[in-house]
Amino acid sequence: MAKSVREVLNRAFEGLPTYRATFADLNAPSGLVVTLKGAIGMVIRVKTVHVDVPAANQTPLMIRKYSTAESGGTPGTAGQRVPLDSNSAAARATLAVYTAAATAGTLIGEVFEDDIFTVDNDAYRGDRVHEEFGKGDGCESLILRTAAETMGIVLGAGSNPLNGYIEWTEEPAVADPTPNI
């Protein structure tokens, strides 16, 4: 069903329901360590992935998109999925963290890769990733359109501790959200 002009204008002024989930002091292994899974009937738009490592580690970090969910691994304690507006419904996307790496699903592609945690003149700088998707003219967010689609954070080497957050929006999937004008 097409949205009314009022619904379109409200979205422009109020925005979409936005959520944030944190992970802190995660003793992360090498491999797939954090995932955000899509939800049935929802469009999940990943807006920000922030990762901070306070300890000195040479750890390549990758953000990848998968068409199927991960399997196995040892789950850790995921942070609560918090709506940024208390009037928003509970989040439908699912965050998972792993203390033993999960087996990745079917890779669609890599959207970020960098050897970010570096030592400079034998003094650790305390590096971080703050990757924002959908910023700029015409740019899209990292979008999960099915319950099977997953965004994952992959480490090339173990990291202890690993801290950060993922921020995303959720909206019902519709064939064409353009109003009939």
Region locations from a protein language model:
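Extended, solvent-exposed segments with strong compositional bias
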Residues: 88-141
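C-terminal interaction-tip segments
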Residues: 3-45, 52-83, 138-181
